[in-house]
Amino acid sequence: MNYITSLLLLSSNTFLHPTTTYLQSMNDSIVLVTSSVSTELTTLGYDPISTISGVNGTNNIDYIKLLNDTNSTFVQLDNSDTDIDDSSSNSEDVSSNDEQIALMNSSSDFSDESDEGNDSDDNGDEVENMENNQANESDTQNENDRVLNYDTSSSENENENENENENQLEQEHQHYYYKNRSKFYNHFLRYPEVVINNNDDRAELASTKNNLLVRSPKSNNRRLIGSSRKKTLKSKSKSKSSKLKHKSRKSHKRRPKLLKSKDVETNEITTVEVITLTITKVLARHDLAAIVTPIQQHQSGHLIIGYPLPIATKSRLHGYYKSSGVLKEVDANPTEEYDSGDGKENTQQNPIPEKMRLPTNDDPYSLKPTHHYDPSATMQNPHKQFTNRTGNFEIPTNVQDIDDITFPIDLSSSDSTSNLYSILPMNQTNLPDVNTLSLAPGTGSVPPRYSNHHSEFTVERPPRPSRTKKRPRIKAKKTMKVSTQISSAMSKSIHITRIGSTSSGIASGITNIVIPNSSSSIYDNYQDSSSDKQPVSLSMPTKTITMTTDTTSEPVTITEKLDKPKFPDIFTIIRSKLLSKKPQETKLHSPTSTDTKSSKLMSSSSSNNNKPEISKTTKEYNQTQESTSYNTTKAVPKTSVVSSTTSTKPNDQGNNILNSFIQFTETIHSRIRFPTADDNNNNAGNNYHRRFTGVVLPENRQFVFRSASQNLSFSVLGLIILLLLLPGLLIIIM
């Protein structure tokens, strides 16, 4: 649809509404679909959006309903190879005029059966053009036979006299004619006063010879042309005898070269239609009144798609053109001139006749009760046929080419349909100027939706509707770094040294790291506690982990900030805690003395933070702690580690190192409160637990160490354990 809409953006100074769009090009025809809905169009029973099969030639569109819409206009343009400048300068030759009038004529054989076979147009040939022989047989008629007759009650001599006067006017001005594709038609373009009531008098109209229907039973095609007239027996015999004589001369003289093909019939006429179709049905179902004028025609043959035509439903859209051809400010209320009950309505270009209301005969531009037309009345005032309905008798001056069209279209909407479409409706009362267009009815402070620049045509996209079901979004994994800060009391006794240093020993400040039971971990307590509603963010206050030393009861606190967790740093710090720079002797102490000094994992369990109190005395890790006194002269000391077993084998010592690291990591992990979906915080639901790459916590609580880069295999981890066990192995050997 965007591609089709872009075809209508003809020039830089074109003002087009996006609802008007090219629909299709078929049989050398360009079909325009224009939104043109009256305020009472929903009562006509428009079906939902159906396939546009009637445009393709299958004639499935209910044209009767479309033609009941008084704004629907069917326009047929002659495709003769005449120059437009010739027609505007009144210097057109007779041959092109003969073919022009010949398109509107036919033999009386067709007109005799024009009121029969109304249901015989289902063969899909309505889209086709007139047959070539129809145009050829009427090309050889005399000038008295090349005119249009509108008086059915006059005699044949009166018809010939009237036809002579009209033929002289036809040589001065070339005009395009309407051609309807159904029995019921709407408006004439050149003869704006000849409008027949198409609402209730259909059976009466079908019986008259003034009907503009012509059917062709010979070719099994229904030919709907502008007019059908009575012909004399002389004209019938003359047209039949000269059919084959002038066939090749007239049929190929004025046809464009690009349209020459074997199928002469379908390439004879180019049709331009402005119809109400798909967009009309969409707008009608939502009670949106979109009112659009039919096409006006300039003297030179250019098309002016003008301002909305005042219709019988008392439309408030009755603006008029400025002399420059742009919109001019109009009143919000309809004037008395455009009232549906007033007879002045028929002074406009394409009036909509009331049911039985006919104007007085003193108006030269009014519709006569006998549908008689005086051609000299319109041709003496050629300007009025384009502009008399708009209230201004000046022809727009900006129409210089077919690409330069002033096309203001208004959508006057109800209050409930402003957000239903991608094309928001505009209100006519908010159009004091083209550059200050409003978005919605009644709002004057809304910025203009259309660009007021002449170099572009932009339409703002309306906000997309909110999704009812949110799609899952893949979030990038971000590694959380744990930065552990050691207090000053801790840093006094911890010295970081390299692995394998000859002077490495045990730090006097650390002999035991208290870890709670894994069976009843803090993480499970968080999951099971239903009373703990308030989440603890990652930027929670710092926690203190109190650990006791083996020599003194002075607690050593480690202050941790969980803003930036970094598990490789934890591994480095734990390793540095297990190693010491200065060799110091560690005295053996009994398990009973250690039990009195057994450490507790302290947490600031205040009611404000809703942190669960954790005051678990450790199971007697100190009973299993292995402390060895060694000689200070030994170059390679033995490292004492926290273990959970009583075994003193070197392999068990390596397992103790790994277990102590895993338990310490579990402690940190269990202290972290993950945000839930119920959090009011903006960071809730960001799945912070998925960003941990250091420790994987399966459901069976079997902790598996995994590095962030996942390159650290268990073989590398075993190599690290062997490096840590080398001092112990050397001591055992010695």
From Swiss-Prot:
Residues 87-98, 592-611, 632-650 have a biased composition (Low complexity). Induction: Up-regulated upon milbemycins A3 oxim derivative (A3Ox) treatment. Keywords: Cell membrane, Glycoprotein, GPI-anchor, Lipoprotein, Membrane, Signal. It comes from the Eukaryota. A lipid is attached at S707 (GPI-anchor amidated serine). The keyword Transcription does not apply. This is Predicted GPI-anchored protein 49. The gene is PGA49.
